């Protein structure tokens, strides 16, 4: 009887360790960063440096007194005056349910090979209120993380 109880506990521990290994092998690791700041190929880029895909749940931007339930590109075009007039500006939207594969990079805002539009965008950003963003995403196993502009690393959300 003691051997049976020991064997059952051992099997349960093995299943738990296997499950934890599966979760880690599919974990997304999302970051948002500037690329080539101030240069002619400037971009604000979302990276998935994890081993598994990330599924976007929500994106919000907060200023001193307002929270906007919108992605970065929409915020730039709808809230920051003058952004829509910048030539050579490209953007990608982040939508709930969007899948970001492991190893993928998405330029949320980018300017290709043009210094003058880069300078114009950076001036508009510097003259705008400071923002913080919150990106909530999940793994294929429905583990959820939050990434904010104040943190360097995503934080796992408890259920």
Per-region residue spans from a language model:
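Membrane-proximal alpha-helical anchors
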Residues: 1-73, 81-82
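An amphipathic alpha-helical interaction surface
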Residues: 39-41, 55-159
């Amino acid at each position: 009887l003691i051997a049976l109880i020991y064997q059952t506990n051992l099997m349960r521990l093995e299943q738990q360790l296997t499950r934890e290994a599966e979760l880690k092998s599919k974990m997304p690791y999302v970051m948002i960063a500037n690329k080539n700041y101030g240069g002619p190929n400037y971009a604000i880029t979302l990276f998935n440096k994890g081993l598994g895909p990330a599924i976007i749940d929500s994106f919000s931007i907060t200023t001193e007194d307002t929270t906007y339930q919108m992605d970065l590109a929409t915020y730039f075009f709808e809230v920051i005056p003058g952004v829509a007039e910048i030539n050579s500006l490209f953007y990608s939207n982040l939508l709930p349910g969007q899948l970001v594969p492991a190893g993928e990079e998405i330029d949320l805002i980018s300017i290709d090979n043009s210094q003058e539009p880069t300078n114009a965008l950076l001036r508009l950003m510097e003259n705008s209120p400071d923002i913080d963003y919150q990106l909530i995403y999940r793994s294929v196993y429905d583990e959820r993380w939050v990434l904010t502009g104040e943190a360097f690393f995503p934080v796992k959300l408890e259920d």
